[in-house]
C-alpha cells in the first residue's frame, strides 16, 4: 500500500516538532537535529520536516511504496502519461537509503516516488555540499531541462547543490 509523502522546509526543528506532534497527537518516528519524520496511519502519510533546503514551506511531495513492484507501477504510470521521469536508482537522503525517481508538476513542485530500503545514521552519504534554495533531496544540478528516462523533457528546477 502506498503512503502519501510531504516534506516541508522549516526554520526551527524544535518549534515545528512541538507543533506537529500536537497536531498529529504523535511523536516523530525519527528525530534528528535537522530532521523529523512522522509515519502516520490515519491518514496514511510520511510527513517530514527539515532545516535543509530553501525558504520555509513545501519542499517536495511524493509517494512512498511498500515494495519495488509498487514503485515500478508508479514509474510505468508516469511514463505512460508521457511525464519526464528522472531516475536516481538507489540514493541516500533523509536518514534513509531508497530506490527513487522524481517528477515535476506543471507548477514546478518536485514529486518523489520512492521505496525505503533502510535507515542510515546520517542525513545523506553524499559529500557535504552547501545548502541550496530548492528541494532538499531533488537531484543536484542547476535549473535545467532534465534528461528523462522516459517521456518528454521538462524544465525542472533542480538544486545547484543538493543537501542530501
Q: PLM features: what roles do these ranges have?
A:
Residues 13, 62-110, 118-121:
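Vicinal oxygen chelate
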Residues 1-46:
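Core segments of cupin and vicinal oxygen chelate
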Amino acid at each position: 500500500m502506498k503512503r502519501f509523502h510531504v516534506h516541508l522546509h522549516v526554520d526551527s526543528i524544535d518549534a515545528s516538532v512541538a507543533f506537529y506532534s500536537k497536531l498529529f497527537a504523535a511523536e516523530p518516528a525519527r528525530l534528528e537535529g535537522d530532521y523529523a519524520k512522522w509515519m502516520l496511519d490515519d491518514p496514511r502519510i510520511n510527513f517530514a520536516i527539515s532545516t535543509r533546503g530553501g525558504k520555509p514551506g513545501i519542499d517536495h511531495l511524493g509517494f512512498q511504496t511498500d515494495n519495488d513492484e509498487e514503485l515500478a507501477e508508479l514509474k510505468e504510470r508516469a511514463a505512460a502519461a508521457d511525464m519526464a521521469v528522472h531516475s536516481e536508482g538507489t540514493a541516500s537522503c533523509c536518514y534513509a537509503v531508497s530506490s527513487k525517481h522524481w517528477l515535476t508538476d506543471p507548477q514546478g513542485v518536485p514529486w518523489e516516488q520512492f521505496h525505503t530500503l533502510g535507515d542510515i545514521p546520517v542525513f545523506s552519504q553524499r559529500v557535504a555540499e552547501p545548502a541550496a534554495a530548492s528541494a532538499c533531496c531533488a537531484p543536484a544540478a542547476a535549473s535545467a531541462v532534465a534528461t528523462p528516462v522516459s517521456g518528454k523533457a521538462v524544465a525542472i528546477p533542480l538544486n545547484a547543490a543538493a543537501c542530501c
